[in-house]
């Protein structure tokens, strides 16, 4: 199961998930000047970040919107980035947040679990219900793939829907999490975690322990660290024995060179930030 590969990557390299949400204005001007087209520039920047952080991260999350916004040349960079990650045997999360049913969802599954855009995990939006998850299950069962489904997110607007009362003292996010956790038990790996994970933001620490205890077999993709205000202490509460999830950081890693005095090598700065993040979370877990 892909869940086992993720668990073992975390054990080896730590919980950091490097977010390749690469905006053109994140790229240093000196580096930009070397390229005549945006596709090559984006891919070359990503490649430098990947090489610098591969051995200090569990996986990479590639947010497709940053590439779609540039049209075909952006999608070419997206494709090349995924291909390079596969070449490096890195685990890939395609952050696509799809949420449809039936034939449409089958095509989304085919598009992102096969071919040019193949990834190990994708993100999904469950708003349409559990049948929006069904078309991905054959890939989870037979093709070593996985999904991270939105459960309780880190944005302020999460209060608008995710926190609505759903009866029996539960909120909407509780119901979503419980349904996914139950489904996920059909796809458990040898380490006790499922290939059906949840996106759980780290900016609401007061619910952390309860969620970790209830969603006992669900690996968490944890956004909100760094730029959104989440701390190592916040993150530690969502993990179990230092595992059971990965912690995404995008801007804080990609833009580390802007915050460091020795900022000539943006990739080396990204590596230093990833190591600092990994070590801070490890220290918080031990406290």
Curated annotation (Swiss-Prot):
InterPro entries: Aldolase_TIM, OMPdecase_AS, OMPdecase_type-2, OMPdeCOase_dom, RibuloseP-bd_barrel
Active-site residues per Swiss-Prot or TrEMBL entry: 97 (proton donor)
Keyword Lipoprotein belongs to the record: no
Catalysed conversion reaction: orotidine 5'-phosphate + H(+) = UMP + CO2
Gene Ontology biological process: 'de novo' pyrimidine nucleobase biosynthetic process; 'de novo' UMP biosynthetic process
Pathway entry: Pyrimidine metabolism; UMP biosynthesis via de novo pathway; UMP from orotate: step 2/2
Record keywords: Decarboxylase, Lyase, Pyrimidine biosynthesis
SMART domains recorded: OMPdecase
Enzyme class: lyase
Disulfide partners: none
EC number: 4.1.1.23
GO molecular function, one term: orotidine-5'-phosphate decarboxylase activity
Family indicated by similarity: Belongs to the OMP decarboxylase family. Type 2 subfamily.
UniProt-recorded name of the protein: Orotidine 5'-phosphate decarboxylase
Species of the source: Clostridium perfringens (strain SM101 / Type A)
